[in-house]
A protein has these predicted regions:
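Short beta-strand scaffold segments in enzyme catalytic cores
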Residues: 12-15, 34, 41-45, 144-147, ...
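Gly/Ser-rich oxyanion-binding loop with an adjacent helix/lid
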Residues: 79-172
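Short alpha-helix boundary/capping segments
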Residues: 62-65, 103-104, 202-205
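Charged catalytic carboxylate motif
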Residues: 69, 111, 260
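Short coil/turn connectors at secondary-structure junctions
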Residues: 39, 83-86, 149-150, 175-178, ...
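C-terminal nucleotide
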Residues: 2-22, 26, 48, 171-322
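ATP-binding N-lobe of GHMP and related small-molecule kinases
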Residues: 1-100, 117-122, 291, 311-322
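Charged/polar, low-hydrophobicity segments characteristic of intrinsically disordered regions
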Residues: 72, 145-157, 212-220
């Protein structure tokens, strides 16, 4: 009872913020992301004779809340499969980057969910049910449900476990996105940011705006309208951080380098390069552009002294040979 799977990290385009159900990880509103093709997590899951679940991430045992989130996935798989065996889970992140906002938790959730699903024999019962795997992955990290399906994905918030999952709605043939990732580190966790969001006086309005923006961004992607896409994703990133900063603790998750990269992107636009910035809950910046501009964008960021990862649109979670 063993399987191995790979899942790519994702760039959240319309970000979710806050959870109305923390156990099931049900968000307040829909969200949209695109998978990368440059960073991923490989997970191996085996069910057997262990006395307890063992979870290793990049060779280090997980404990506490990090382990609990993995066990939530394993428990759901065991429930569906009607088994009681404990599991050994091993994950490896590629590349190893000490930055926040690269989506490795989403890739881990997606790869663990698929590997556990197959290791427990659920594929023989339900077939390769991507929607079910998406729902299972959500229990580890909300965004993992989008990493499962890959390409351009929309997570429908739903009302409970049965209808909160992601659907792929477009791929690079619709919008041939390329993006330069500037990885930047921080200490805070995504969960802290989600809890902080709900105390912002602007949070309720954010829910309304985010659902409306999902419709606009989805339409722009399907129609290949890069300018509308870029403008909406930039605005969403700024709103996301504004919500966090106006919460009860006043969390500031951007760094001075985040602001420098934002200004570099604006300078690029003034010089005629189509480029737009995007951030998730951390300081890492994604610079979205088109194939004809990606080399120039990456070069300018490197000349400014930043490490750069260049990515295109990545696929969904997939099995790999052991």
């Amino acid at each position: 009872m063993r399987a191995k799977a790979r899942a790519y990290t994702m760039q959240a385009l319309v970000k979710y913020h806050g959870l109305k159900d923390w156990r099931l990880r049900i968000p307040y509103h829909d969200s949209i992301s695109v998978n990368t093709d440059v960073a991923y997590v490989v997970a191996e899951v085996s069910f057997g004779d262990s006395e307890e679940d063992v979870v290793m991430a990049n060779g280090t045992p997980l404990t506490g809340r990090a382990k609990e989130r993995v066990v939530a996935v394993l428990d759901r798989v065991r429930e569906l499969a009607g088994i009681k065996e404990r599991a050994v889970v091993r994950t490896e992140s590629h590349p190893r980057v000490g930055a926040k906002g690269l989506g490795f938790s989403s890739a881990a959730g997606a790869s663990i969910a698929l590997a556990a699903y197959v290791a427990a024999g659920l594929d023989k019962v339900y077939g390769r049910d991507v929607t079910l795997v998406s729902r299972i992955a959500r229990l580890l990290a909300g965004s993992a449900c989008r990493s499962v399906v890959g390409k351009y994905a929309r997570w429908y918030a739903g009302t409970g476990d049965h209808d909160s999952y992601a659907v792929r709605f477009a791929d690079e043939r619709n919008l041939p996105l390329r993006f330069a990732i500037v990885p930047l580190g921080m200490e805070a966790t995504t969960e802290e940011a989600h809890r902080e969001a709900e105390s912002s006086p602007y949070f309720r309005r954010r829910i309304e705006v985010a659902n409306e923006r999902c419709d606009r961004v989805e339409r722009a992607i399907k129609e290949g309208d890069f300018r509308t896409f870029g403008v909406e994703v930039e605005r969403d990133s700024l709103e996301l951080h504004a919500i966090t900063m106006t919460g009860s603790s006043g969390m500031i998750l951007m760094s001075p380098d985040t602001l420098r990269v934002i200004e570099l992107v604006r300078q690029m636009r003034r010089s005629g390069i189509e480029a737009y910035f995007s951030m998730q809950t951390g300081p890492t910046v994604y610079v979205n552009t088109l194939p004809e501009h990606i080399d120039e964008v990456a070069q300018r960021l490197k000349e400014a002294g930043y490490e750069v990862m260049v990515s295109g649109v990545g696929g969904g979670a997939e099995l790999v040979s052991s």
